[in-house]
Amino acid sequence: MSRSLDSARSFLERLEARGGREGAVLAGEFSDIQACSAAWKADGVCSTVAGSRPENVRKNRYKDVLPYDQTRVILSLLQEEGHSDYINGNFIRGVDGSLAYIATQGPLPHTLLDFWRLVWEFGVKVILMACREIENGRKRCERYWAQEQEPLQTGLFCITLIKEKWLNEDIMLRTLKVTFQKESRSVYQLQYMSWPDRGVPSSPDHMLAMVEEARRLQGSGPEPLCVHCSAGCGRTGVLCTVDYVRQLLLTQMIPPDFSLFDVVLKMRKQRPAAVQTEEQYRFLYHTVAQMFCSTLQNASPHYQNIKENCAPLYDDALFLRTPQALLAIPRPPGGVLRSISVPGSPGHAMADTYAVVQKRGAPAGAGSGTQTGTGTGTGARSAEEAPLYSKVTPRAQRPGAHAEDARGTLPGRVPADQSPAGSGAYEDVAGGAQTGGLGFNLRIGRPKGPRDPPAEWTRV
């Protein structure tokens, strides 16, 4: 184990040696990763022929995220009944070269059966989900699991919820019973409820707990972990990479020249856009540094005060989204891997967002909002910033938890960059409103302005 620990410490020392150049170095590395990905596609090293076929196009959630042919998951179960072999998913190899992960998109309404065919055929025991059903007012994943006393039937698969509980304030753990042709299996699902799309969590702690619990539930079996978010690339890639590095550490396989850049390149060659943004790449460095520091600190008394000696990659998670001018403000002493405390974003009176009805938030100057639980009150927001949301309370509420704001982010979490993607990139559940006639979004408005009094009032 000492050799692996020495490699981990060497990695941290290299980070520390970068000093103030850290931001520029990571930006350059991520730019190189993007360039390599583009070159692989241009040279045909990573092709997407299957996903581009007319019969498969509608099975892709996003038209620009197609599975690589070289590593794509090929379904054989139920093919004799006329079902296709296609699903938007790729295998990713683990530290021992086995097919350790299936990185896939969040199911669409018409690909639910394909998703469960995948789970059943490859013996998946644990599913890691890094998104919500609705995010920023857009449908990001079809619900493929059962709810309490509401079994889900899709094709020949019957899914029943056995129990659900909160692993921590961010992670929901569900135990599902899946029955197919009179055979039943248990499948566990871990859902990260507050990871913003194209952003990062405020701290790695709960994500590391999620990965650790997934491995505990998985046991020593060879079955792959099924990992997905909405597109199955950005957040999915972060989870796969963190677990991959953790397995390197546990199996004492950290090489002396360990490079997170090389690990992400491996992921990218197997699943398109794995670790999708520079912010996610920075967060990945933060997470791995914390993992290594904790391991060194627990393994040997010679590594005392390791947190203070670690590379100052970030003062805290706010570094990822703080303007450079603000970073010049003096901060209290402490290294990157101290206990991270991030100021919470303003709470909102709205509950979790599960429906979009084009109801505007309060206009600017409307005053502060109400408090929910122990969350802070929300200030007035401009009409341009007000999202389209309706207040719909979720079925399961974690005990004593904060109400989440309209963007699906906990008041104790700092929302990351949530800028919408280009037109056509997402499935918008608000796009089906009728433009003529009356409907839920087109009600008769209250008459405005003074009106003449009724004729009866003027009679003598």
UniProtKB/Swiss-Prot annotation:
It catalyses: O-phospho-L-tyrosyl-[protein] + H2O = L-tyrosyl-[protein] + phosphate. Keywords: Cytoplasm, Hydrolase, Nucleus, Phosphoprotein, Protein phosphatase. Residues 361-460 are annotated as: Disordered. The modification Phosphotyrosine is found at residues 389, 426. The modification Phosphothreonine is found at residue 393. Residues 449-460 have a biased composition (Basic and acidic residues). Substrate binds at residues 197, 229-235, 276. Residues 26-291 form the Tyrosine-protein phosphatase domain. Expressed in brain, colon and several tumor-derived cell lines. One of its GO terms (molecular function) is protein tyrosine phosphatase activity. It is an enzyme of class 3 (hydrolase). It is found in: Nucleus; Cytoplasm. One of its GO terms (cellular component) is nucleoplasm. GO terms for biological process: blastocyst formation; negative regulation of ERBB signaling pathway; protein dephosphorylation. Belongs to the protein-tyrosine phosphatase family. Non-receptor class 4 subfamily. Differentially dephosphorylate autophosphorylated tyrosine kinases which are known to be overexpressed in tumor tissues. This is Tyrosine-protein phosphatase non-receptor type 18. It comes from Homo sapiens. The gene is PTPN18.
